[in-house]
Amino acid sequence: MSEYSLFTSESVSEGHPDKIADQISDAVLDAIIVQDKHARVAVETLVKTGVAIVAGEVTTSAWVDLEQIVRDVICNIGYTSSDVGFDGNTCGIINIIGKQSPDINQGVDRAKPEDQGAGDQGLMFGYASNETDVLMPAPIVLSHRLVERQAEARKSGLLPWLRPDAKSQVTCRYENGKVVGIDAVVLSTQHNPEISQADLQEAVMELIVKHTLPAELLHKDTQYHINPTGKFVIGGPVGDCGLTGRKIIVDSYGGMARHGGGAFSGKDPSKVDRSAAYAGRYVAKNIVAAGLAERCEIQVSYAIGVAQPTSISVNTFGTNKVSEETIIKLVREVFDLRPYAITRMLDLLHPMYQDTAAYGHFGRTPQQKTVGEDSFTTFTWERTDKAADLRAAAGL
C-alpha cells in the first residue's frame, strides 16, 4: 500500500530583515578575511527602521571600512530609499565590535595548527537525500528558487513594482519517500502601492511561480496563496527588526533534518557552528552520491579547545546499502573532522561567505571566484569528490 506524507519548507528573500543582517555580518567577515585569513571573527547585526547595529568580537590585524561595507550591502539588496522601507545611503550605523576573549584564544590556538581546538562546544548536523539533483530536500530547494526568482524579476526590471522583502513556502507530497507533487505554494512579496492585487497575483503566478516550479509537480488541486493578506507595501526593517542568525532552518535543510542550533553567518571557520556544519553536509552528500544510502543525516559534536570530535553518528532512515556502523567507520577513514583539517579540506580561508548568506548554504553550485588577487572556489562542501573513495572502500 502506498504511503503518502506532506512536508513543508520556507525561504525568505535577500531583502528580508533577518537576511539583511546575515549578509552584513558575512560581508564584514569577508572584508576581514581578505586582509587577514587567520582572523577570529564573530559579528552580529541588528537592523531596524533607519539604523544598523553591528556588534561582536574580532581579533585581527585588518582594518576595514565597516560603515561603507554596511551601506554597500543594504544598497545592493535594493534598499536605497525610505519609500522602500530602508535607505542604505542615509541610515545610521552603530559599531560596537570588541576583541575576542583571550580565554577563548588559549583554548583554540595551538603551536601545531592541526591541533587547533574547537572554538566552542556544540553539535552540528549534515544531511543529504537523492530526491533532487543537488541532493537536497525538494521543499527547501523549491522555496529558495521562488524567492531567487522574485529577486531576479525585481532587479532585472521584469516586474519593476516588486520590492526587496519576500517569503516563500512550498508543501510537497511524498509517496513512498519520493516527491510526487506540490500541494501548496505560498509567496508573499513586498510591492509598491500602485500595483493592484489582481495584476500582482497574475504576474507573480505566471512569471515567478509557474516559471520556477516543475510543471510535472503542479496539479489541479495545488493551492496557491500569493500575498494572501493583500497589500504588502511596508516591509524590510521598517516592518520587522532583523537579526543575524534568526533563519537557521532556511539556511540549512528547511526542517527536513535536525539542527544543532548554531547559526552560520558572521563566524570565521574556527567556529565549528559553521565549519563543522559545512563538513557535515560534505560528508552526507558524498555518502548519498556514493550510493551508500538514499538519505543520510550525520551528527558531529565538539568540546571547546579539543580538536577531535566528541562523537560522530549517522542515520540513514533505513535506506542504507551497507550497515550504519560501516558508514561511520568509512567516515572516520575518509574525512578528518578536526577543525583545522575541515578548514583545509574545504579550503575555507577565502572571502566566500556573503554568497552563502541568502538562498541557503546548501544545495548551491560551486563557482570559481576572484577577489583582489585571491582566486578560489565557493561552496566547496557541495563537491562529491569523495564519493568514489567511499564506494570503493564499501565494496560497492
Curated annotation (Swiss-Prot):
<comment type="function">
    <text>Catalyzes the formation of S-adenosylmethionine (AdoMet) from methionine and ATP. The overall synthetic reaction is composed of two sequential steps, AdoMet formation and the subsequent tripolyphosphate hydrolysis which occurs prior to release of AdoMet from the enzyme.</text>
</comment>
<keyword id="KW-0808">Transferase</keyword>
<feature type="binding site" description="in other chain">
    <location>
        <begin position="231"/>
        <end position="232"/>
    </location>
    <ligand>
        <name>ATP</name>
    </ligand>
</feature>
<feature type="binding site" description="in other chain">
    <location>
        <position position="16"/>
    </location>
    <ligand>
        <name>ATP</name>
    </ligand>
</feature>
<keyword id="KW-0963">Cytoplasm</keyword>
<keyword id="KW-0547">Nucleotide-binding</keyword>
<feature type="binding site" description="in other chain">
    <location>
        <begin position="246"/>
        <end position="247"/>
    </location>
    <ligand>
        <name>ATP</name>
    </ligand>
</feature>
<dbReference type="GO" id="GO:0006556">
    <property type="term" value="P:S-adenosylmethionine biosynthetic process"/>
</dbReference>
<keyword id="KW-0479">Metal-binding</keyword>
<keyword id="KW-0460">Magnesium</keyword>
<comment type="pathway">
    <text>Amino-acid biosynthesis; S-adenosyl-L-methionine biosynthesis; S-adenosyl-L-methionine from L-methionine: step 1/1.</text>
</comment>
<dbReference type="GO" id="GO:0006730">
    <property type="term" value="P:one-carbon metabolic process"/>
</dbReference>
<dbReference type="InterPro" id="IPR022628">
    <property type="entry name" value="S-AdoMet_synt_N"/>
</dbReference>
<dbReference type="InterPro" id="IPR002133">
    <property type="entry name" value="S-AdoMet_synthetase"/>
</dbReference>
<comment type="similarity">
    <text>Belongs to the AdoMet synthase family.</text>
</comment>
<dbReference type="InterPro" id="IPR022630">
    <property type="entry name" value="S-AdoMet_synt_C"/>
</dbReference>
<dbReference type="InterPro" id="IPR022629">
    <property type="entry name" value="S-AdoMet_synt_central"/>
</dbReference>
<feature type="binding site" description="in other chain">
    <location>
        <position position="57"/>
    </location>
    <ligand>
        <name>L-methionine</name>
    </ligand>
</feature>
<dbReference type="GO" id="GO:0005737">
    <property type="term" value="C:cytoplasm"/>
</dbReference>
<keyword id="KW-0554">One-carbon metabolism</keyword>
<feature type="binding site">
    <location>
        <position position="240"/>
    </location>
    <ligand>
        <name>ATP</name>
    </ligand>
</feature>
<dbReference type="GO" id="GO:0004478">
    <property type="term" value="F:methionine adenosyltransferase activity"/>
</dbReference>
<dbReference type="InterPro" id="IPR022631">
    <property type="entry name" value="ADOMET_SYNTHASE_CS"/>
</dbReference>
<feature type="binding site">
    <location>
        <position position="263"/>
    </location>
    <ligand>
        <name>ATP</name>
    </ligand>
</feature>
<keyword id="KW-0067">ATP-binding</keyword>
<dbReference type="Pfam" id="PF02772">
    <property type="entry name" value="S-AdoMet_synt_M"/>
</dbReference>
<keyword id="KW-0630">Potassium</keyword>
<protein>
    <recommendedName>
        <fullName>S-adenosylmethionine synthase</fullName>
        <ecNumber>2.5.1.6</ecNumber>
    </recommendedName>
</protein>
<dbReference type="InterPro" id="IPR022636">
    <property type="entry name" value="S-AdoMet_synthetase_sfam"/>
</dbReference>
<comment type="subunit">
    <text>Homotetramer; dimer of dimers.</text>
</comment>
<feature type="binding site">
    <location>
        <position position="240"/>
    </location>
    <ligand>
        <name>L-methionine</name>
    </ligand>
</feature>
<feature type="binding site">
    <location>
        <position position="18"/>
    </location>
    <ligand>
        <name>Mg(2+)</name>
    </ligand>
</feature>
<feature type="binding site">
    <location>
        <position position="44"/>
    </location>
    <ligand>
        <name>K(+)</name>
    </ligand>
</feature>
<feature type="binding site">
    <location>
        <position position="267"/>
    </location>
    <ligand>
        <name>ATP</name>
    </ligand>
</feature>
<feature type="binding site" description="in other chain">
    <location>
        <position position="100"/>
    </location>
    <ligand>
        <name>L-methionine</name>
    </ligand>
</feature>
<dbReference type="GO" id="GO:0005524">
    <property type="term" value="F:ATP binding"/>
</dbReference>
<feature type="binding site" description="in other chain">
    <location>
        <begin position="165"/>
        <end position="167"/>
    </location>
    <ligand>
        <name>ATP</name>
    </ligand>
</feature>
<dbReference type="Pfam" id="PF02773">
    <property type="entry name" value="S-AdoMet_synt_C"/>
</dbReference>
<dbReference type="GO" id="GO:0000287">
    <property type="term" value="F:magnesium ion binding"/>
</dbReference>
<feature type="binding site" description="in other chain">
    <location>
        <position position="271"/>
    </location>
    <ligand>
        <name>L-methionine</name>
    </ligand>
</feature>
<feature type="region of interest" description="Flexible loop">
    <location>
        <begin position="100"/>
        <end position="110"/>
    </location>
</feature>
<dbReference type="Pfam" id="PF00438">
    <property type="entry name" value="S-AdoMet_synt_N"/>
</dbReference>
